[in-house]
Amino acid sequence: MPKQKTHSGAKKRFKVTGSGKIMKQQAGMRHNLEVKSSKRKARLNQDQPLAKADMKVAKKLLGR
């Protein structure tokens, strides 16, 4: 049986930490940035852990 390939879209969107958590980029930093406060932009620019409900699917897509 051939090896399972890593999902290209998931590979670009998620990063796995050393402890095994999956991190994702928050939405809302692509456009209309002039109307958002610096405080809000700083908060949106941080990586966020993936929800537990999505973790199982994401791990499968990443081949983990």
UniProtKB/Swiss-Prot annotation:
InterPro entries: Ribosomal_bL35, Ribosomal_bL35-like, Ribosomal_bL35_CS, Ribosomal_bL35_sf. One of its GO terms (molecular function) is structural constituent of ribosome. It holds the Pfam family Ribosomal_L35p. Residues 22-44 are annotated as: Disordered. One of its GO terms (biological process) is translation. GO terms for cellular component: cytosolic large ribosomal subunit. Belongs to the bacterial ribosomal protein bL35 family. HAMAP family: Ribosomal_bL35. This is Large ribosomal subunit protein bL35.
